[in-house]
Amino acid sequence: MNSFSNEEFDCHFLDEGFTAKDILDQKINEVSYSDDKDAFYVADLGDILKKHLRWLKALPRVTPFYAVKCNDSRTIVKTLAAIGTGFDCASKTEIQLVQSLGVPPERIIYANPCKQVSQIKYAANNGVQMMTFDSEVELMKVARAHPKAKLVLRIATDDSKAVCRLSVKFGATLKTSRLLLERAKELDIDVIGVSFHVGSGCTDPETFVQAISDARCVFDMGAEVGFNMYLLDIGGGFPGSEDVKLKFEEITSVINPALDKYFPSDSGVRIIAEPGRYYVASAFTLAVNIIAKKLVLKEQTGSDDEEESTDRTFMYYVNDGVYGSFNCILYDHAHVKPLLQKRPKPDEKYYSSSIWGPTCDGLDRIVERCNLPEMHVGDWMLFENMGAYTVAAASTFNGFQRPTIYYVMSGPTWQLMQQIRTQDFPPGVEEPDVGPLPVSCAWESGMKRHSAACASTRINV
């Protein structure tokens, strides 16, 4: 395998016949001979490209603006910038990151309805004009700090069927929307469109239909007030892995007819979205090492459900936890499932087990209960679908460092990226033949891992 670090990408370029699985196994073998068996990620950039092609096919009218907050790793942002996505930034720092990679301000939306004045001024000074708002106070701030801004009115949605609800904090009602549009007109601030977010982990695609219908109402209000609105932002909430009840294409099959009904292609309205986890969740797999182990009595398991515990119960402590990558358990309603790096014997007995992080906090529990064969200090566990809302919010609490990320890319992936960069595929094109691209996509048929039966099973998306 050749490891390249050039001006644009710092990753392992896979020789023909090698996969992301090989990189993971190679890294485990390398560190197994050292004392520092630190946790690490393998991130497959081919998986991200595959998601992009899938997006173009499923939502041909919708331009993706990647939600940087989801995973702000520089290599990820570089990759998405190279293939032409826009960017949803929530702060000055995210804008700086994106623009440092040469992304023009026209490909950025400052999608935070509540912004610090100094950061509004920063956006103004650096050419970022598109930004969201949902209150009169925000209008007044923008009028003073960035009078040439192109504002997008964030409306509230029914997010009652989402895992992570957002409308409790953001979004104007339809009644308030008219008042805000009238106030914006008085302030001579240009409102160019409407945005919404149905919530992360949306389980009912009809929520998108209602939100798109509501956006149409606000467009009509804007026309009555005197605005020529031309941008619709349908937000995020798209799944990033396949282990979900509602698949990506099930959602898009509902969105597309709604867009055609309320914003037909000849309406002149540009449509964007803010996918985050969709692009990165399945690209990342985390490898953690068991640093300690305890055999405990039933009443000492730390489980909230003692009835299913057995007399022989194990507690395993690993070198990443909820203050690190697994913060998604606390903040993103995630449920994670460990996979075993070593193949268990066919007749191996399984025991009730729990998995804990390395910090001194009793809150640092990753999996409350699962069935595992007896593991040992130095053994490895793998966690798939760990690319979204993990590394971005990880801390160094107790002095534990964030895991290193090893990026991989196959030759066909690199070639296709160059083709996209030079030809700038427009939305709606037929998906190019990626040939052997899937060999570099993490955790497909080439990587069948051994799954533990756990009470906590999946990451919500």
UniProtKB/Swiss-Prot annotation:
N6-(pyridoxal phosphate)lysine modifications at: 69
Required co-factors: pyridoxal 5'-phosphate
Pathways per UniProt: Amine and polyamine biosynthesis; putrescine biosynthesis via L-ornithine pathway; putrescine from L-ornithine: step 1/1
Annotated keywords: Decarboxylase, Lyase, Phosphoprotein, Polyamine biosynthesis, Pyridoxal phosphate, S-nitrosylation
Activity regulation as described: Inhibited by antizymes (AZs) OAZ1, OAZ2 and OAZ3 in response to polyamine levels. AZs inhibit the assembly of the functional homodimer by binding to ODC monomers. Additionally, OAZ1 targets ODC monomers for ubiquitin-independent proteolytic destruction by the 26S proteasome.
Catalyzed chemical reaction(s): L-ornithine + H(+) = putrescine + CO2
Residues found modified as Phosphoserine: 303
Site residues, Stacks against the aromatic ring of pyridoxal phosphate and stabilizes reaction intermediates: 197
One Gene Ontology MF term: protein homodimerization activity
GO terms classed as biological process: putrescine biosynthetic process from arginine, via ornithine; regulation of protein catabolic process; response to virus
Residues that hold pyridoxal 5'-phosphate according to the record: 200, 237, 274-277, 389
Active-site residues annotated for this sequence: 360 (proton donor)
Residues given in the record as substrate binding sites: 331-332, 361
Enzyme Commission number, as recorded: 4.1.1.17
Entry keyword Thylakoid: no
Pfam families: Orn_Arg_deC_N, Orn_DAP_Arg_deC
CC annotations in GO: cytoplasm
Modification S-nitrosocysteine, positions: 360
Gene3D superfamilies with a match to the protein in the record: Alanine racemase, Lyase, Ornithine Decarboxylase, Chain A, domain 1
Domain of life: Eukaryota
Annotated function: Catalyzes the first and rate-limiting step of polyamine biosynthesis that converts ornithine into putrescine, which is the precursor for the polyamines, spermidine and spermine. Polyamines are essential for cell proliferation and are implicated in cellular processes, ranging from DNA replication to apoptosis.
Subunit relationships: Homodimer. Only the dimer is catalytically active, as the active sites are constructed of residues from both monomers.
Family of the protein in this entry: Belongs to the Orn/Lys/Arg decarboxylase class-II family.
Name of this protein: Ornithine decarboxylase
Higher taxonomy: Eukaryota, Metazoa, Chordata, Craniata, Vertebrata
Gene that encodes it: ODC1
